[in-house]
Every structure is written in structure tokens, then in C-alpha cells.
Regions:
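Generic structural "secondary-structure junction" signal
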Residues: 2, 7, 11, 76, ...
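Short, charged, low-complexity patches
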Residues: 16-20, 72, 121
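N-terminal small/polar loop signature for handling phosphorylated ligands or for N-terminal nucleophile
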Residues: 29-33, 39-104
């Protein structure tokens, strides 16, 4: 995939904590603009920088009054499916750089309709350009909230239903 934010996790300015705090705050403003509850499901791949990125986003979202639910390590299609089925999240946030080098990482977003629209991307960019960081670096991480098991079970059940019976026997 090539959508979302991508770059070297250690050097790209848009993957550093200061920017990610602003991005988290911006996501909450975007949710409010869309009349959605600012509740976000975050998943990641196995890259070593994923938890740092996740925690910076969580701090920014919390600083703006939003809530994060952590799905842990999941493939992108699982996150998209859960966000669509649950319909309780303003967006899903996937921390991954897919097939890019291990030193890279990235962030992509989905809504309950799947990938966010071009209009959504433009709204986020506009809100981001107007946003400034204040004191969210000083805030502690909010209490970790895990993905409810039934939401993941629903995804796995859906996958199994696509397979011929006894394919995994």
C-alpha cells in the first residue's frame, strides 16, 4: 500500500512524537467536525517503532478529549473489518509501513466505510495545518483499553466462513 503517512521511523518529521501529538489532537477535531464520538481503534504491525508511534498518538488523542482502544498486532484488513462492523469508532488507525523497509513505519486511517475518502484526507490536512501543540507532552498515557474480544472473534469467524469446510483440519 501507498496510502497514509510513510517514512523512516527515526528521521521522518511526521513520525516524531511532537507531530504525532498534534495529529492525535487533529483526529479528535476531525471526529467532532463529522459529529462522531472521538473514539479510535489502533492496531499495529510488528515493527519496533509501532508502540512509540501508538503511544504518542494516544497522548494527543487523550489531550483533546478522545478515547483510544488498542487492538494490538493485527493485519490491516482485520482493523478495517472490525471498524466497519462495530460502527462505534470515529476511525481506525493502522500503524504499518506494509512492504517498506523495517526502519520505516507509517500510519493509515479507515472509517466505517473502509479507507477514508479524499474529502476526509483534505479535512484532516486543513485541520492539521491550523493546529498547534500546547502541553500534551506533559500528560501521562491514558489507561490502556483493549479491543473487546467479541469484535476480534467476529472477524476471525468471518474469515473461517470464507473457507471450505475442513480446510484447516
Amino acid at each position: 500500500g501507498t496510502d497514509g503517512i510513510r517514512g523512516n521511523a527515526s528521521h521522518a518529521p511526521y513520525l516524531q512524537d511532537d507531530f504525532l501529538l498534534i495529529l492525535g489532537q487533529t483526529l479528535v477535531a476531525w471526529a467532532h467536525q463529522s459529529d462522531a464520538e472521538p473514539r479510535f481503534l489502533i492496531a499495529h504491525d510488528s515493527r519496533s517503532s509501532s508502540r512509540r508511534i501508538q503511544n504518542a498518538l494516544r497522548r494527543g488523542i487523550a489531550a483533546a478529549g478522545g478515547q483510544t482502544i488498542i487492538a494490538g498486532m493485527l493485519p490491516s484488513p482485520a482493523l478495517i473489518s472490525i471498524v466497519r462492523q462495530a460502527a462505534t469508532y470515529a476511525a481506525g488507525i493502522m500503524i504499518t509501513a506494509s512492504h517498506n523497509a523495517a526502519a520505516d513505519n507509517g500510519i493509515k486511517f479507515c472509517s466505517n466505510r473502509g479507507k477514508i475518502t479524499t474529502d476526509d484526507e483534505q479535512q484532516l490536512r486543513l485541520l492539521l495545518s491550523k493546529h498547534t501543540i500546547t502541553t500534551c507532552k506533559l500528560l501521562p498515557l491514558p489507561r490502556l483499553k483493549q479491543l473487546p474480544k467479541h469484535q476480534l472473534t467476529s472477524y476471525v469467524t468471518g474469515l473461517l466462513e470464507l473457507m471450505p469446510s475442513r480446510a484447516l483440519a
